[in-house]
Amino acid sequence: MMKALLLEVEKFVNNLLSKKLHSNYLYHNLGHTQRVVEKTKEISENLGLTLIDAENLEIAAWFHDTGFTESDENHEEKSVKIAVEFLKSHKFAEDRIQIVADLILVTKMNAVPKTNLEEILKDADAAHLASKDFFKFNSLLRKEWELVLGKKYTNKEWIALNLSFFTQKHRYYTDFTLKNWSKDKEKNLSKILKNQKKLKKDNKKFKQKEEALNLKKNKSIVPERGVETMFRVALRNHITLSDIADTKANIL
């Protein structure tokens, strides 16, 4: 029976996100949800969860970003509302509905997981940080924020934002992810630092070229002014000599 419900959940969410999610959500789309579901299963299987716990997690993973179909603001709460309505209509146990709701809410940016299940979903939702495709996903998120939130970042600002998230705001929680994903996350962090270093170097080169061009421009202006001055002096001298010649002629 539970397998049938999981299939219904998958079908419902696939249909909802395919039809109602705005195309501006380039990162938080059906593909992201499917990846989170797969990563949730991967962690669950490696940690040996009970069937019920694994099912609760999978349901929460499917529903965790459905709220984006209504609004970006407080989308986790909206996701809970959508999940609760669906699960109640399918006679899902009340205590399990509450667990699913709590799991969805832990995917909020600054939420701290309190249970093992919450740690698993929190880690699965951030699996992209350790992905070989991190920079592709990161680029999609940047464009999504620009389209949905109107937030535009310079390369310098975007790199700084990512460094802050990697080093200060994010951590993996489960034993499985700490053991298996930390190294790949560090690799991506190292690449971000390299990008920052390259950006600084490129900016320095650009500034030096700009200064060199300005210097060259200033040097080219000076001779022109010098020539103008020379012609003015020559003209003045010519006029003076002419005046002298005229004066002498008059005297004679």
Question: Across the structure, where does each feature detected by a protein language model lie?
Answer:
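Amphipathic, well-packed alpha-helical segments that form the structural scaffold of globular domains
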Residues: 14, 18, 37-41, 84
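Short alpha-helical hairpin
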Residues: 2-19, 221
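Glycine- and acidic-residue-rich phosphate-binding/metal-coordinating active-site segment common to enzymes
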Residues: 76, 84-110, 116
